[in-house]
Amino acid sequence: VNEASPRPACPGRYEPAPYRLDLSTCPSIPVPPPGPRSREMHARAERIMRGYSGQVRLFPVVFAEGKGCALQDADGNRYIDFSSGIYVTNLGHCHPKVSEAVADAARTLMNAHDFTTPIKLRLLELLMEILPGDFAGVQLYDSGTTAVEAALRTCRAATGKGEFLSFFRDFHGKTLGAVSLARMNSVYAQTRMPGFYMLPRPDTYRPLWQRPDGSLDTEKYLDLYDEFLREGTSGQVAAVVIEPIQGWAGSIMPPDDFLPKLRTFCDKRGIILFADEVLTGMGRAGHWLCCERWNTLPDVATLGKGLGNGFPVTAMIVRKPYADAVDKISASTSYGGNPMACAAAVASIEVIIEEGLLEHARELEAYFLRRMADWPKKYVIVGDVRCMGCLLGVELVKDKVTKEPFDEAGKRVYVKAFERGLAWIPAGHILRMSPPLVMPIEVAVKGMDIIEEAIAETERELAMI
């Protein structure tokens, strides 16, 4: 079956819940950030904890509190959150229903290994209710990368094969199998396992092949995959692994015909299609599964991030034809499926349904697309803009013909927007944005105003106008 089952519409238009901070006062920057308390606290932490991310090194602010779409740092500055942590807090920070569910579970039962608990049963049945198609097997984990590893084991068990095809610039985690699916930098590249192969995927802004009319030619990519299967593998490919939308790479969207054609490509060759939906699932792209946007279902998928709204809970899900293979791999982990994690996930799913957040994410998407539509014409450094649900990307370039990435501009825009009170995620020359699904439109307008001001100021500084 190649079609996603239609899902019932979420009830009503989204209305902000009353618990959230008064966003009319956000942003508020009484102390130029990073302020003295943030700098002092981060310096102490950095002496002990090594390997902070690039975004922290660029702007070492210390966050002390979050509510809804607002964050407050140790110096009392308040920010609009356009990061959702790292694509995690889909319901905003500290949603009371989720917080209360976790607290109640912590008072009742914190860990029962992999025994069934009432709240675990509720989560498993709820997943079967909301997911499209014929998903019939689930395992619960505590991080995206462990769920990905479980999915790789499942694909091996289901097919008896051990090779995998993945794509340049996808991201799947930092354990050995997950790292082998991607190439992030030279350190990780040295640890890749044999039998893992990466291929280019269609990028409408940077196509490798085009039709005479200038549109991207998806068939050329599929021809390359077919040739690589014959010439570059031993013929033992278990699965094709893909992020439906590339998150780490900068919210890069596939052309509309790619996922359906990749589904057909896998079906014809007896290869499992494994979609890593840790980032894109649970409403982030406006659907329970991002693949639904293209009326396509994977055979195996992973869920995480927004599944627990910040609490570490992830899942591997498998469609009925491959469900028996899940019995061959152990579901036992120290923390996967613990009562607190399951409570967070159940509460998060219920809030998405009750507050109509799938529908609201698509309303936000429509606003963001309208707002950014003229940016490539309006700004010299803006090469491309894209959005699906609450996943946004703005690509900055030095030259619109060569499309040379403009990393320096990306850094400047990131810092300038943060200084104005917008918390978000850098990615070199690509501006990544992932606001919570609960964000009111008027707050989204404020956030986009800040970003546009930062882009315009950066252009002036770099003498690009």
Which positions does each model-derived feature cover?
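Conserved N-terminal phosphate-binding loop of PLP-dependent enzymes in the Aspartate aminotransferase
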Residues: 2-465
